[in-house]
Structure formats: C-alpha cells, structure tokens
Amino acid sequence: MKIINIGVLAHVDAGKTTLTESLLYNSGAITELGSVDKGTTRTDNTLLERQRGITIQTGITSFQWENTKVNIIDTPGHMDFLAEVYRSLSVLDGAILLISAKDGVQAQTRILFHALRKMGIPTIFFINKIDQNGIDLSTVYQDIKEKLSAEIVIKQKVELYPNMCVTNFTESEQWDTVIEGNDDLLEKYMSGKSLEALELEQEESIRFHNCSLFPVYHGSAKNNIGIDNLIEVITNKFYSSTHRGPSELCGNVFKIEYTKKRQRLAYIRLYSGVLHLRDSVRVSEKEKIKVTEMYTSINGELCKIDRAYSGEIVILQNEFLKLNSVLGDTKLLPQRKKIENPHPLLRTTVEPSKPEQREMLLDALLEISDSDPLLRYYVDSTTHEIILSFLGKVQMEVISALLQEKYHVEIELKEPTVIYMERPLKNAEYTIHIEVPPNPFWASIGLSVSPLPLGSGMQYESSVSLGYLNQSFQNAVMEGIRYGCEQGLYGWNVTDCKICFKYGLYYSPVSTPADFRMLAPIVLEQVLKKAGTELLEPYLSFKIYTPQEYLSRAYNDAPKYCANIVDTQLKNNEVILSGEIPARCIQEYRSDLTFFTNGRSVCLTELKGYHVTTGEPVCQPRRPNSRIDKVRYMFNKIT
C-alpha cells in the first residue's frame, strides 16, 4: 500500500481543520462531520483550540482511498506556533496551502509558503470558502501571483454563487504556465506542432515536485464542494519520500505529547524498513529502546498495531525518546533543508495562584517544556522564583490555558522582559590553586578571557599539553566552562569572547574529572569579574510588506520603536521595508502595523544578532547548582 504524509497549512480561520474533517468524511474514514464551532473535530483536541477555533498543536489523523493511505498533519496557523509548523514540515511528502477566497493571501500564508519553498515541499493551493457571496477569483489569483508565486496553474473552472459548480479544465489554456516554463515545449508550441497531453502532464509533475509550479484547486470544506476531486488529486499527485525495497530501519521523532493519564508519547515518521512490536531499536546511534506499545492512525482513530512500514507515522509510548531523535540508521534520513526554530526572546516569572500547587506546577512545566523546545524554565536559587523563557505572548496564553485545563493549575505571570547576553569588556586572567582555601576541589585551573567582535560567539582553546593533563580532565574543564558561560555576571549567557585554559594541576590518584568540571565555572566567574561584562540585547532583521498607501505611516513610526529602515522597494503596488529592530520593540511595532493597515501588512523577522545596550544593566537571577553555589559564595566574599 502506498503511504503519503501531507500537511494542511493556512492562516488563522482559513478552514484547515474543517477541510480535514471533510477529507475524512468523504473518504469514508468517519461517518459524521465534526464541527469547529461545536468542538467536535478530530484534530483540535485542547479546550483552547476548540474555544478559539484555531490549531495550536500538530494534529494527526488519516484516511484510506483505494490503495493509498493518507496521513494528514493539521498544522498550527498562528505566528507563535511556527516551531510546531517547522517540525511538522520535516516529515511531509507534500502540502495543501489553504487560501480563503474571501480574505485572500494573509500574512501567515506568506510565512508558511516561504517555509514550504525553503524546505522543498511540493505544494497545492486550495482556494477555500468559494461559496461565500462577493467572491472575485480573478482577484485571488492575482493576489497569489503577486504575494506567493506567479508560477501557478489553474486546474478547474468555477461557477460561483448561486450556481455553485467546480469542474476540471479540459481546455489547453490551463497548460500555458507549463509550456512557458519549458523552452523545448515553448519552441514546439510556437512552431505550430501539437503537444501531447502526456508530455504536458509529465512536465507539470516534474515542476510540481521540484517546487517550481503550484496547481490551484477550489472548493468549500464547510459545504463539501470540490472535496472528492481534492482527494483524487492528493492520492495521485503526491509521492512518498521513502526508501523502496528492503532496507534498514530509519525513523525520526517529530512530536512529543503527554496524555491525560500522563503517558509520554513519541510521534515518529518512518523513512525506511519495518518496525515490529518488541523490537530493540538503536536511537541516534547510541542507546537502544524496546518497542512495547505501538499505535498509528487508521481512518481517523488511533489503533494498536504490531508492525509499521516505511512511510508510516507511528506513536510509541516511551520515556526516553527526544524531539529529533533518529531510530535506526541515521544515514537513511532524507537530506531536507532545515529552518532554524526561532530562539526564545522573552522571559517572565510564574507562580501558582495557590502556593500549595507549586510542585504540581513544576511537574506540569517539565512535561510542557519536554514537548515544546521554545519553552524553558528554571528555579532561581536565591528567590526560588520559577523563571520561564518563551517566544511570544500568545504562546504564554496557551501555556496558561493548558496548565488550567490539563493540569488544573492556575498561574500568575509578571510582565515579560527580553533575554539579553553578556560580553567581556577587557582581557583578564585568573587562577584558583589546589589546596588553597576556599577551593575544596582537587584541581587547579587558570583561565584567560578576551572580548571578540559582536557575532563571533564563544571560542575556547587549551594551551595545556595533553601530556601534562590528560584528555578526560581537559574535557571536564571545557564542559565546566560551557556551563559557566550560561550565566555571566548579570545572569545572562556569555558570548563573543575567547576563553583560554592556560594552567591546570591535579593530584594523582585523588583528582577526578568532576573536580575540574566543578571548579571551571567558578574560575570563569572570577575572571569575568576582573574583565567586567557589558550587556547585549537581541536585534531582529525585518522585512515589512505593506500596501503603498501605508508607506508614510510605517516609515515614520519606525523611530518610535527604535527600528532602523535601511532599504525600501516598490513591487506590485506593495512596499517592502527592510531594516533592524530591538527584539523588545517588535511586538508593539508588529501590532501597530497590523492595526493601521487593517491586517494587510506582513512583518517577517529573524534574529540578526546582538548589539551593546545603553542604560542600566538588566539582571537575571542565577540558576541553582547545589554543588558549586556554596563555593561561589565563598570566593565572592574574598574577591
């Protein structure tokens, strides 16, 4: 049986969850349509998803059509959940990008399409909600050409309200874009020679799968228009990106989820081989795990299985698998372009509304952060506050609602602040000697630190000979320094500097690598105190796409948000502003743009780097380490 994995992507409220329901219903996987409004859909599982009518976590379901099984990945559609989207994209064989016939191409549509093209995923455009009044498809087509890609091929003829009808094109006009993109076909056409349908279809298929051509289909998911045709297109047009024939096992973990009974589930895409129940499988070429329970989606329901084949998405109950773990042979994993997940740029303090629920809150955060790499937390060793770092405010709203709905814990949040970094101000050296109080470790370490240009990162070198200090001790020093760099003088990560291990001494046989590992961050803190550090704040590069009539407002408002516009371009009655902005200002600037352009602007950002801040330094509480905090305190008293 052919197995394909497709993604359903769209901006908020374009109808992707409703489309998923229609695909399941028309294929016979379910006997009754679920409703977003009634909260009965198969893929929006949390209360917050049902209340808002938006997808927050990746939902997975499936249907079978003739000899093809289709796994559907119903991905999130909000800016703050792009990490979920990117993880899901890595397992797809193809994508359906929904565009609302009423709303056209929205900001989120452009961001998602950018990701799909960057990762090389064949994509179909599905224009949804064509049953609404006042639809002008020619305007939607033009919108797609200007904002997404001009390389589209319209596959259907559409009669709009009130005589709703969608039929496949049979005329030659649908092939214009295909012919124009191939010199041989164009020359043949211009010379008056006839073109066979087969060669046109082959050319379309080639360009579709190399992501240089995008077929356009139409329908209404809510009223079941065009869905049967879309099912045929999905099963015939997409290929499975799996190894054919006998091969070793290879699979990749792309999602971690906890059930209401606190069972930990790992979602895995199999790329080759066969996975059997009770198999012992090597993970990321290291430890092995035993498969004790295995599930997959069959016609919209999760079912236990005893084997799974290449191309399948399986779910294992396992406590040790992590996101991006590879099961089996890592060499068989497809080489697909990656999109870096955005870094958490905000932090805040969280406490339970009821103090007696503190342990419940910590247990819940452990599970949530395990599932979401963009949420990190620690407990301050001095104030005992719980510190969270995260990506955006909507993400925090979702976590708050999840804590209340699933874990029955209400929380109180402080106003979030930006996550900074630190860089040494000058060169400095410091040595802590063995058996010299208050050093309790059987190790001597001497370090030097030098500032480097912005963007250089942390560089480490050792000038201590391996003949003098063996590799295990040297590795322990490097590990301790990397740990120490996580918290500088103000509590932020240390970067843009060179740290040199200049001196080391051990006593045989009492010294161990642990002595060097524990002492290294203490020496690093002392050398940073001699050098001093300056605070660096994150800056984002941005591209703003806005209608030409809003140029003046967008440009003039930039200084108010500390934004520096470095380039302005005009394209298709749209202005593209490029520049950079402090991360602490982007949320307000983006909200302002959305407000005064009535949602017609797009603001794409990525981390550019860090700049030196001015003004009073912002401090972050240190994370606790019971083994070295007391020694740190003693050294800080004497220096």
Curated annotation (Swiss-Prot):
Question: Domain tr-type G spans what residues?
Answer: 1-242
Record's keyword annotation contains Protein biosynthesis:
yes
Q: Which PROSITE patterns match?
A: G_TR_1, G_TR_2
Query: Cross-referenced InterPro entries, in alphabetical order?
Result: EF-G-like_DII (IPR053905), EFG_II (IPR041095), EFG_III/V (IPR035647), EFG_V-like (IPR000640), G_TR_CS (IPR031157), P-loop_NTPase (IPR027417), Ribosomal_Su5_D2-typ_SF (IPR020568), Ribsml_uS5_D2-typ_fold_subgr (IPR014721)
GO BP, sorted A to Z? response to antibiotic; ribosome disassembly; translation
Gene Ontology terms for molecular function: GTP binding; GTPase activity
Q: Alphabetically list the UniProt keywords.
A: Antibiotic resistance, GTP-binding, Nucleotide-binding, Plasmid, Protein biosynthesis
The answer, when asked if Transcription regulation is one of the entry's keywords, is no
Query: What Pfam families does the annotation carry?
Result: EF-G_D2, EFG_C, EFG_III, EFG_IV, GTP_EFTU
Q: Which residues bind GTP?
A: 10-17, 74-78, 128-131
Family per record = Belongs to the TRAFAC class translation factor GTPase superfamily. Classic translation factor GTPase family. TetM/TetO subfamily.
What does the UniProt function comment say about this protein? Abolishes the inhibitory effect of tetracyclin on protein synthesis by a non-covalent modification of the ribosomes.
Instruction: Quote the NCBIfam families the UniProt record gives.
Output: small_GTP, tet_protect, tet_protect_M, tet_protect_M_W
> What is the protein named?
Tetracycline resistance protein TetM
Q: Per the UniProt entry, what species is this protein from, by scientific name?
A: Neisseria meningitidis
